[in-house]
Amino acid sequence: MKIDDIIRKCIEIPGISIQRSDFSTELLLKEKEGKGSMTFFPLFPGVTIAYIFVNSPTWTAPNFREDSSIEKGPLLLNYCVTGRCEIILNNENFVYVKDGEISLTERFAQKQYVYPRRIYEGMEFFIDIDTLTAQSVWVQGEFDINFHKVVDRFCPDGATYISPATSEVEEILTKLWSLFDVSIPFSISQMKIYTL
C-alpha cells in the first residue's frame, strides 16, 4: 500500500480536507469535537514522515476493510511526543502509545484513533519496504538495513512492537521533531539526514 493510496482514502472521510504544497501534503481534521493535522513530507522513495498534531478525542481511520485482501500496510514507526493514542488494529490487537514511546507495526487502525487526553503530538514514518528496496537501494547498501528482517524481528505474525525510546533514539527524534518549525526546503534536507 502506497502513501498516496492512504492519503486518498483519508480524504474520503467527512471532516478531513487536504492541502498540497511543493514539498508536503497536509491532511486537516475539522469537526465539532476538535481539529488536527498530519503533514507528510516524502524523504526518499518509500519513506515519508508525517508530523501529527491533534486536539480532538478521536480521528476516524481510513476504511481499508472493504478490500479484505489488504492485511498489511507500510511499516509504520510512530513516535509519541506528548499525549496518548489508542487503536484497535485490523488484526484485533489493542495498542496504545504514550509520551516518549515508539511503536512499529505493519497493521492499520480498524475504525478510529482515540486520544484520551484529547491532545496528541507525534511523528510517524511510513516505510514502503518494496519501494524502498527497489528505488532506494543505496540506503540498504550504505547502512546495511534489511527492513524485512526488521519486520521479522519486531513484528512477527502481525505483532506490534512498543517500547520507550532509548535516549539515543529520542535525541534524534527530538531533533527531527524540531525541524517542523524550520523553513522549507532547508528543513527537508535535515529531515533526510536525521532519518538516516
Q: Predicted regions span which residues?
A:
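Extracellular structured ligand-interaction cores
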Residues: 49, 72-76, 120-124
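Extracytoplasmic
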Residues: 61-63, 84-86, 101
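Ser/Thr- (and often Asn-) enriched beta-sheet segments in non-cytosolic proteins
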Residues: 17, 28, 48, 86-88, ...
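Alpha-helical bundle regulatory/interaction domains
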Residues: 88-196
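N-terminal low-complexity or simple alpha-helical regulatory segments
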Residues: 1-73
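Glycine- and acidic-residue-biased ligand/ion/polar-headgroup-sensing regions
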Residues: 54-57, 70-91, 129
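Short hydrophobic/aromatic-rich motifs at helix boundaries and adjacent loops
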Residues: 9-10, 21, 25, 81-84, ...
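Arginine residue identity/basic-tract feature
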Residues: 8, 20, 65, 84, ...
